[in-house]
A protein has these predicted regions:
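Bacterial N-terminal signal peptides that target proteins for export
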Residues: 2-16
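Extracytoplasmic/secreted envelope proteins and their assembly/folding machinery
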Residues: 71, 75, 79, 85, ...
Length: 183
């Protein structure tokens, strides 16, 4: 006959706690492009030129780490917003545009854990005339978004929603600001 030792219930409780922690924290998923495109973005005017977009400073998401905004995803979100708002006559995928919009993600602050997930992102937006090399507009932006505790069961899910929300806010503010410049 085999008897249960006192170590077995402790081991079971520890493994159960670990399993619940993994279930509730979830795996990190990157911010989705479509979720970073603002629904209500609009341009006050349309520029008759072409533009290409380049994003740097983003990071790929490690599934065991925290959600991030990748360069390609944010680049695509900004590009789709420019197309949707008809801010420029044409948005090019290569460096052949009349203007280049460079966006640098230079600071992202995320909470380590918690109920609500508030994310702050700082970016630098620069619009450059490709022919002359002249910087025609430059702006530093700081955006914040909070995903409430009821927006997703897992903290990782809330953090992904917060990353998407902050990306959307920054995208909308950036496009709204630079469309006002005189070209």
């Amino acid at each position: 006959m085999r008897f249960m030792t006192t170590a077995q219930p402790v081991r079971f409780a520890t493994l159960s706690l670990l399993a619940w922690t993994c279930l509730l924290s979830g795996c990190a998923t990157p911010a989705a492009t479509e979720a970073m495109i603002p629904e209500t973005a609009s341009a006050d005017k349309t520029h008759p030129y072409s533009v290409n977009v380049e994003v740097t400073g983003g990071r790929a998401t490690d599934p065991t780490g925290t959600p991030q905004i990748a360069n390609d995803a944010f680049d695509e979100a900004i590009t789709k917003t420019l197309i949707k708002t008809e801010t420029f006559a044409k948005v090019k995928r290569d460096k052949a545009g009349n203007y280049e919009l460079s966006v640098i993600i230079f600071n992202v602050q995320q909470p380590p854990y918690g109920g609500s997930a508030s994310v702050t992102m700082e970016t630098g937006w620069t619009l450059t005339n490709q022919l002359t090399g002249e910087i025609v507009w430059q702006q530093a932006l700081r955006s914040t978004y909070t995903a409430s505790s009821d927006s997703d069961v897992s903290f990782s899910g809330r953090l992904t929603k917060a990353m998407e929300g902050v990306g959307q806010n920054d995208n909308k503010e950036g496009v709204t600001e630079f469309v006002r410049c005189y070209l």
